[in-house]
Amino acid sequence: MALLYADEDFSYPVVQRLRQLGHDLLTAHEAGQAGQSITDTAVLAFATAAGRAVVTFNRRHFIRLHAEVSSHAGIIVCTRDDDVLALADRIHQQLQSVPTLQDQLLRINRPARA
C-alpha cells in the first residue's frame, strides 16, 4: 500500500479510512508540522524526504508545484467531498491503479451532483 503524507488541511476522517484500507499515512499534526505556516514547497520537500506522497485539498498550489518540481514522491490533489468514505474509496481505487506515485500527480475529483 501507499506511503502518504496528509497536509494540515486534509480531512482526518479520510485519513482514518485510508488507514483502514491499509495505507500508511502520516499527518502534518503527527509530524509536528501543523500550525507553523509551512509553505507548500516545504510540505512537498518534507514528504519527499520521507518517501511519502502528499495528499491535499490544495489543488491549485500543488498542481503548480508538480509542474515546477522535477522530482517528488507523488502528489494527490482532491476535491473536497462531504462523503468522506466515498472520497477515501476513490483515492484508494486510484492508488491501486498506478504502479508508482514517484513524480506522479493524481487528481481525485468529486463526482458531479445529480
Give names to the regions the model predicted.
Residues 40, 50:
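Basic, amphipathic alpha-helical patches used to engage nucleic acids or provide basic targeting signals
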Residues 1-8, 12-20, 26, 33-35, ...:
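Acidic, PIN/NYN-like endoribonuclease modules and their adjacent C-terminal/linker elements
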Residues 52-65:
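Acidic, metal-binding active-site segment of PIN/NYN-like and related structure-specific nucleases
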